[in-house]
Amino acid sequence: MDVPMEKRENDTIEEAHEQDDIEQLVGDFVASQTGSSERLGDIVFQDLSVIGAGVGHELVNNVPEALNRLLKLASPAAWWSKRPAPSRVLLRKLTGTIREGEMLMVVGRPGSGCTTALKAIANMREEYLATEGNVWFALNARHSTADPDRASHLEQDLQTVLQLMGLEQAAGVRIGNDHIRGISGGQRRRVSLTEAFCTRASLYCFDNPTRGLDSSTAIRFLNVLRQYTTRSRCATVMSLYQASDVAVSLFDKILVLNEGHVAYYGPASSAKRTPQDGMQRPVPLRPADFEARFWESSFYQQAVDAAIAPQSTASLPKPSGYALPFYRQIYECTVRHYQIFLTDRGTWIAEATGTIVQALLLGTLFRDQQDVTQGLYTRCSALFFCVLIMGLQASAEFGNTFVQRPILLKQKALRFYRPGAYALGQILADIPWKLIFILYSLPIYWMINFQRTAGHFFTWLVCLYMGLMALSVMFRAIAVFTNSPTRAVLPVGLLLNVFIMYTGFYITPPGMKVWLSWIRYLDPMYYIFESIALNEIGDGSYQCSSDHIVPRGAKYNDTTFQTCAVSGSVPGNLNLSGNLYILAEYGFKYMHKWRNVGINAAFFVFFAILVTIGMERFRNATERMSTIYYQKLPWTNTSTSDLADVEKPPVTTDLGGFDVTSNDEAASSRLEEDHHVFAWEELSLELGDGKRLLHEVSGWLQPGSMTALMGMSGAGKTTLLDTLAQRINIGVLSGGLYLDGCPLPQSMGRRTGFVHQNDIHLDSSTVREALQLSARLRRPESISLEEKMAHVEVIIKLLEMEDIADAVIGVPGAGLNLERRKRVSIGVELAARPDILLFLDEPTSGLDGNSALSIVQLMRKLSNAGQTILCTIHQPSSQMIEQFDSLLLLIPGGKTTYFGPLGPRCKTIIDYFARYTRPCRDTENPADYLLEVSSNTETDWYQIWKESPEFLSTQEQLQDLLHEKEDASSSGSDKAYAVPYLEQLGVVTRRAFINYWRDSDYVLGKVQLNIWMGLMNGLTFLQLSNDLADSRGRMFSIFVSVITGPVLSLQIEPRFIILRDQFLARENESRVYHWSVFTISALLVEIPFTLLGGLIYWLLWHYMVGYYYTSDRAGYAFLMYELYSLFVASLAQLTAALFPTVLAAQTATGFVWLVVNTFNGPLSPPPLTPRGWRWFYNISPLFYYIEGIGTNAMHALDITCKGSEIQMFNAPLSETCGSFAAEFFNMSKATGYLINPDATDQCKYCSYADGDQYVSAFHPH
């Protein structure tokens, strides 16, 4: 395709047009600031130092280490000793000034203190132990005025900002996340930057904002900031790890940091010259040496002179200004929460479905209750379920609080709203939403046949609603004052467990132990249950059921000599007052009905205030940032205090002189040359809505070649990489993938390496363990274990990871830094020795320029050694791009604009584009040039490519390669997995156990949960006697042991999901091990910890309650409880496996356990259950557990009734009680006994004679 010369001339002025557009849009945005806020003016900082927690390295906090720390805390000597917390200096004596309208670039390798400097200048100091020095602002007050037309200005500004950031097309699209599909990663990054930009701040601090953006988009964003900073007279501070010459030219000043030391601060134009001036003998080697040279320079003296604060200055206050008043912040937050509810349809549809299913299940289970005494227990059981649903629903609040916390902290820093306004807005949004949730439960009320009057219905509704609101803010308050979800599970679980126990149903208030009965007064569930029980039963009248009439039979026709064997009955009267029953059985008083609603309202107000205060106190945790945790410390003869000052040798771009192609002693482990040709032809990927992500993309990878995949954000780079690696699972894919001209073998997954952009690792594994697992499971079984381990050590040396080989990978900020994690990611794939090719997705993203070049040079060495590499890359420098052999360049829509060799100094591809557009300048980065010219939407680069001679040449070469067919599996095994199944299971189970062992919070949390819940059960039913109430207590104590299940599930599910996500994201795609290996290993590793927790709980519970101590009965009870504990673990993992996130799984846990517990026996005894549901008992594990352990506990237990439990009836004249009731006791279904058979007037009857009779009422078998 011939492009006219005029077109190429027009392309040369496109930059000027784009610059004019930016200036116009920025001008409009600045002009709309009718109510300009107060400006800080010049920012001055003098001798600014920051001290952080920790010393940079620690032992990993595994179970033995945690126990050791607990023992030390238990020592009285530890109580009085006041050893200072370990600390280290993160930033040292930073001095300088940022004038109005200036931009300061902060440069340094990761860990040098760039982020710390930005936070210190922005006055965000709560994360650090201490800060020293001062930050001032010159007083330059610009008083704000009210905007009379705020709504129209907001809409205008929105459109302006969307155009500035290139987000017009994404304006109405859901942002999404790792689990919810939305906009692209680059667009998501721009949304975050736009959010901060819209604050109209006087001081902007951006920490590596161009990470994840292509160079063209990055330069545009920096241009926008340059224009806005100049026009609005604000100040901008920004750290950049990979800054091009074009980017540097936009800044006024540069700050260079090295391990917290200032190496340079001054004008950007002098930054290159100053290091050269410092290279005088002796040459500075350590960061402190460079700092000393800087202090001797004229630039330091200029910074000190500028930092001498004039008279009209004041200390920089903590940020306090908000654009909106507090009440308006509450309103905006409330509206936002409504929008979240309405747009997150999946969550509320699932919640509504689950609640309605629960309501229908319970409604059919307890349906059509009649006004007879036999239905009183089931009616109260149904009321208890209404309360239980509220408790389980409210307990899920704690998980959602942690999900929202990062967003809240970010927007708090941006001064969008006070955290207290967010809290109150969330509570106000809950007011109608919780009511809707209760309305889902309406089938319960109408199907069960609760009292059908408006007064009773709305009283039931109000009681449940107010109780739900109180419980919700109560559990939310726990989350607000807890640092992590793992630690919040303990108080949430214990509180839920205690609240359920003391609802008043399991153990009635008259039967509560004196020392624990006070708990019910702090239990909102108790107040709900008492009110709805009084509302439903208190003013009713119930006819005595035939089974409750004593004595009964053909002989007994006169009710004068009969009674109803139910609490609250009157001798000679077979009609029972609901008020007397509820008072005698539960101790509930009718006058408390509305009082309880008021108490729950007070609970709601109190904890709402507490949540508001707690959110106002939200801080980023003062963690030991940038700390590396070791399995064992690599230093043995150096004290901790000394280690903080030891300078580590600098990491150079040279790989330690290790030559992967040399014939040294590691020759046996070096990379074998790859002889496979990987090709793809006419690949297209189309979504269901017709959108094309890839469009007829063709190409190939020659053995030992290194190919770059580039394009603008949203061009489809990662999509193409995932497609080539067979990791795409959306849309319709057409075209072909070939290895040596043949279809891909099933072993393709494990014979290729894939380095993810996000560095997916199990945080508890050490570097060496991660590489060893990859080598053991992905290399063929024919290779000995010794050879695999030797190869791992070679890779560790190759990647210069000897000093961190035994370090736990951790998470960013509490583990390895970004560059080291990237090396680990590459090492994991190299340990598997992929013999086909190696995919890398953005391996240099987030790294500084030196580290990025080091990674690319490493890839070059691997390629030279025979490894085929395909790599996506966003912002390569000219040095980096020249390391590649070929380039595949995409534009939005997944269309190809070029595929072929780069040529020496990229001359081949530059000459190609220069035929159709402006030439590349001598000083211009070729990568920036290619992205800039290909982003011109006025030129149809795809059509130019299709009609170019280069395209025809590549097509001919592709067809030649496809016709040179060779069996791709001939050079290696075509098995999907490299090693046998049992070896997979052993290796993965060992890793899972180590993962648990190094998470002391999880293991000790499980122990603590079982200790506290066992103690609560044991103390609540302490040393029960043989009377009727305590016999009931024996049965319900067993049921209380069952309600530990939801609590333990909340703790098990996050651990399972962490392992599952690791498997699905990387190991499953790479065919490391079979999916069933994961599920079995996850269950196997849970067993010992589950059995330990079960043992602790059972010992505390069984003997405190006073069950049988004999070995046969105690042994049976122990076996049954351990089996129940295993069932809990397996059910929790099943629930977690069915849901994508921890929050979704924990929300579903309440529903799952409600269904499971419904058919356990005591809550809905089989004799009273409708026939349509009785089959469910045959498949209910909890029914067998309670039946077995209940029968074991109650068999041959003689029951004696105390005074209040005795039922009275009169005997006829001239007859003793025994003779009169003889016919009744001869009946097969008769239970109980007469206490005074020889009496002739009032007969005293006990409803049950022994435990077997009592159990038969719940379990007829």
UniProtKB/Swiss-Prot annotation:
Alphabetical list of SUPFAM superfamilies matching this protein: P-loop containing nucleoside triphosphate hydrolases
Superkingdom, natural source: Eukaryota
Residues annotated as transmembrane: 427-447, 455-475, 488-508, 596-616, 1038-1058, 1080-1100, 1114-1134, 1136-1156
Chief location bin: membrane
Record-level Gene Ontology MF annotations: ABC-type transporter activity; ATP binding; ATP hydrolysis activity
Coiled-coil regions listed: none
Gene Ontology CC: plasma membrane
Matching InterPro entries: AAA+_ATPase (IPR003593), ABC2_TM (IPR013525), ABC_transporter-like_ATP-bd (IPR003439), ABCG_dom (IPR043926), ABCG_PDR_2 (IPR034003), P-loop_NTPase (IPR027417), PDR_CDR_ABC (IPR010929)
Residues the record marks as carrying a glycan: 10, 557, 575, 620, 637, 1068, 1226
Family matches, as Pfam families: ABC2_membrane, ABC2_membrane_7, ABC_tran, PDR_CDR
Keywords carried by this UniProt record: ATP-binding, Cell membrane, Glycoprotein, Membrane, Nucleotide-binding, Repeat, Transmembrane, Transmembrane helix, Transport
Occurrences of domain ABC transporter (ranges): 71-284, 678-918
RNA-binding in keyword set: no
Binding-site residues, ATP: 711-718
Subcellular location as annotated: Cell membrane
Membrane topology: Multi-pass membrane protein
Stored PROSITE patterns: ABC_TRANSPORTER_2 (PS50893)
Record's function text: ABC-type transporter; part of the gene cluster that mediates the biosynthesis of talaronoid C, a fusicoccane diterpenoid with an unprecedented tricyclic 5/8/6 ring system. May be involved in resistance to the products of the cluster.
Similarity section: Belongs to the ABC transporter superfamily. ABCG family. PDR (TC 3.A.1.205) subfamily.
Descriptive protein name: ABC-type transporter tndA
Lineage: Eukaryota, Fungi, Dikarya, Ascomycota, Pezizomycotina
